[in-house]
Amino acid sequence: MNTDVISGKKTGSKSWIRVPLLILAAAVAIFAVAEMYQRIQLWRHTRVPVLSNEQPGPFRRDNTLGWAPRESYKSAYTRSTLGGTSYPVRYSVDASGLRGCSTNGNGRKILVVGDSHTHGLEVSNDKPYPCVVARDLKASAVAYAAGGYGTLQERMALERFIPQVQPDLIIVQIGYDDFINNDFDLEKASYINNHNMLRPYWISGQIRYLWPSHFPSGFEYARAHSRLFSNWYDSLLQKKSMREQTVEVDIAKAGAAYPGFDAATTATREVFGQIKALSAGRGLVVAATELSEPYHSAFRKIFQDLNILVIEDAAVALADARARGMDVYARDNIHWSEAGHQIFGDALARGILAHPELGFK
């Protein structure tokens, strides 16, 4: 006899799932409304299409480089120095994503690749250090760079733009974070230099595209397809970066003996060997932005082995200016103000002029 009767009516064997299904349907509806709200708000402020998963701003996803400057992008905004001085910024790149300088020079061309220090979002057109160098050397210059670029991405950019620009001099900007960004395991263990995007790595003699995520791949898929999840995810990463010890702290303590540092050094050396080959017949200069250890010694050994000219004077000049109390950093205390770019560019130009074989005088 069936005893599953309430008020004389049979409930049925599947009635128990109705409440969970209703709860799930309500949760999906709430999520959909919140997601659409986020997308509409983004459209209102940036004009990114409501149904697009593209991130707004000066960079876009790129199948080869991982991410790249958004072509023909223009923007005007306000930035502040670390000392609190506000100033207007007018930013633009051309149809190739190159940030150029208004100097015409004497016909000699400079191509600069690097990371966010080279891209110079904190300063207006003609203010980034590549333009300072171009003016000092009476040359023309263009730069292709993006925040978080590692040495392999810079090599790929050179492959793309050397035929187009036909530069007389190539400048590759370096920083300690290149070692982190050149190695998958080190970047995955980092919270301050992890850009949480699919990117190319040079591993065992070949290019591999990997995502240095702290979370399972499903999180990354959801982040790429949901504005709501992306905002939550980024907030979670920011909180973790404030709590967790990052790999850079461990490397500072252990030095070059830190597990994995050798692999990063090997990859960096091999890719710079490729850059030297790409630059054959042209001037090649490496511009150091800072000289912290153990990265500085590793870089110096690489460039000695490959016979590549590295100029450290600009990093020294910038550090000296800061020690004297000059307001050379932007509010984030990472990137440079207009004064910082000017000091770095002037010192780099003097370093280039000290080597007449580069053809500038």
Positions of predicted regions on the chain:
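Histidine-centered active-site loop/cap adjacent to the catalytic His
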Residues: 20, 33, 330-361
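Membrane-interface motif at the C-terminal end of an N-terminal transmembrane signal
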Residues: 30-46
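Interaction-surface signature
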Residues: 43-61, 152-256
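Short beta->alpha junction loops
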Residues: 143-151
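Conserved, well-ordered alpha-helix/loop/beta-strand core segments that scaffold catalytic motifs
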Residues: 169-181, 234-319
